[in-house]
Amino acid sequence: NFLMKKHIKILKKKLKSFNPRLKEECGIFGISNTKDASALTALGLHALQHRGQEGCGIVTFNGKQYFSEKRFGLVGDNFNKEKVLKNLQGDHAIGHNRYSTTGENTLRNIQPFFADTNAGGIGVAHNGNLTNSISLRNKLVEDGAIFYTTSDTETIVQLIAKSKRVKTIDKVVDAIFQIQGGYSLVML
């Protein structure tokens, strides 16, 4: 609780000096095996805030269940309340600041994305550009995939879910071998 309260205090102070005119690209952050993972992820996203202004999200995992919170606006406006951070339970978290380069500026396109697969749940946050996302998406749709977002990140999630591999890590590797472009990923 001390760390969470300290984090909220820092965010409120930093928000006063934030310049919303700076806009670049998305930012991703991940942390594992630590108490107050949601608060530390919010703080990490805040440090990346200059890179994305449209929205932000955090997915956490408590060893059994995933929790997700995604909102339009700045990190300091959305993750500065103890109640919000307490709802994001778990010692593992990933987060994303959104500045759309592909996909529409809608709530459903705010990452991280979470999906249940036949190997279990997975959370994905992506930064960068997939140069073959349109062709991959078209192929997945031809094969029966249903997309909920217009973000190229969902293509990664769909590739993981579609993989014939058994273990989650093998599904991820299978998906990564199909992706082209420059990007970073954090997964949970």
Predicted regions and their residues:
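Conserved short alpha-helical segments that host acidic/polar catalytic motifs at enzyme active sites
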Residues: 3-188
